[in-house]
Amino acid sequence: GRRAGTENVPGIVGLAKAMELTYTDFDAKIEKMTKLRDKLIKGLLESIPYCKLNGHPTKRLANNANIGVEYVEGESLLLLLDMNGIAASSGSACTSGSLDPSHVLLALGIPHEKAHGSIRFTLGVQNTEEEIDVVLEKMPAIVQRMRDMSPLWEEVKNAMKN
């Protein structure tokens, strides 16, 4: 039992309006985000060596791309991306601010060191193809800059020569 008048009527009306706005053109919004996500994933995997998609290639949220970049530290990569106007995260939204690798990636069996080099891009309906192009233009150079300073990357390059 509730007493009459205790319901949050403005909140209920606001929730109804929010749901209406969310589901207006819902399929078109999902299609747009999926297209942007797929372009981002394809472009990064093609332009950055030792880069892989974490998770299933198609059975994933339309707005989510989690990319593992080997031989770089995820937090450093995030800092450089941020300095270039690119927003990303190294863990799940519920663990933002933590330096630990994503517990989800660890549960998927991704080794600790590879999970530490993983970043998550979360897209929204406001994102544009031009913004994806900026990421695809800037991120490969940022990763290369980081690898050029990495002794581990130097070992990998030497091993590839032999």
Q: What are the language-model segments listed below?
A:
Residues 65-120:
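Conserved C-terminal alpha-helix-loop-beta "cap" of PLP-dependent enzymes
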Residues 9-12, 37, 41, 62, ...:
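A general structural signal for well-ordered alpha-helical segments in protein cores
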Residues 1-10, 23-27, 66:
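A short glycine-threonine-serine/GTX helix/turn-capping micro-motif
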Residues 15:
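Residue-level signal for inorganic ion chemistry
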Residues 19-42, 52-61:
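Structural signature of PLP-dependent enzymes
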Residues 27-33, 49-56, 91, 146-155:
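Flexible, glycine/charged-enriched surface loops at secondary-structure junctions
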Residues 52-70, 122-124:
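A short beta-alpha structural unit
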Residues 96, 100-162:
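PLP-dependent enzyme catalytic core of the Aspartate aminotransferase-like
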